Regions:
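NAD(P)+-binding Rossmann beta1-loop-alpha1 motif at the extreme N-terminus of oxidoreductases
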Residues: 1-51
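Short glycine/serine/threonine-rich phosphate/pyrophosphate-binding segments
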Residues: 17-19, 68, 93-95
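A short helix->loop->beta-strand "cap" motif at the edges of active sites that frequently abuts
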Residues: 28, 79-83, 103-104
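Rossmann-like NAD(P)-binding element
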Residues: 47-83
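Segments forming oxygen-rich coordination pockets for charged ligands
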Residues: 161-166
Length: 166
């Protein structure tokens, strides 16, 4: 029997919380989450992974690019994911900067749809095609494989800059 992929969602706000629930409901992954708000983690029943994860979804706001990059790099160092997927809205070039500084596989995949409730966001996640912009071909392939395994429609674009501008 194949071992389930370990997936970590950083941030349990409207986007991260919705993505976390979609991942859990699929039954295809061992899903963990981290949020600065311990109550959000309790409500979600989220655990913290030990050791390496296969996929790390970043769903934290990027108010300050420098702080965002620093924070994500710390999580990459701690959890050593095979692929990090940035779901956050970030300035163009942020995903490439993370790739250069971490030397890990990183892709950007913006969340599409109307952000009006968690249930609606889950519906939107399943409804829309997930655009993926990798920092290289391997990153794009790892991210697209993960989202396809989740049962989502996927379209790989030319680069992370293209999805960051979406």
């Amino acid at each position: 029997m194949l071992q389930k992929e370990k997936v970590l969602v950083l941030g349990l706000g409207e986007v991260g919380g919705s993505l976390y629930e979609v991942l859990v409901e699929s039954g295809k992954f061992l899903v963990f989450a981290l949020d600065l708000d311990i109550n959000k983690m309790r409500e979600a029943g989220a655990g913290i992974p030990e050791g390496r994860v296969d996929v790390m979804h970043v769903c934290i706001p990027c108010f300050n690019r420098e702080e965002f990059v620093k924070s994500v790099l710390e999580y990459i160092e701690k959890f050593n994911p095979k692929i990090t997927i940035i779901n956050s809205t970030v300035p163009p070039g942020t995903t490439e900067e993370l790739k250069e500084k971490s030397k890990h596989f990183i892709a950007h995949s913006p969340i599409r749809g109307v952000h009006k409730s968690r249930e609606h966001m889950k519906w939107e996640l399943r409804r829309w095609t997930k655009y993926i912009g990798g920092t290289d071909d391997n990153s794009a392939e790892l991210a697209s494989k993960h989202f396809r395994n989740l049962g989502l429609k996927v379209k790989v674009l030319r680069s992370s800059r293209e999805t960051e501008l979406a």
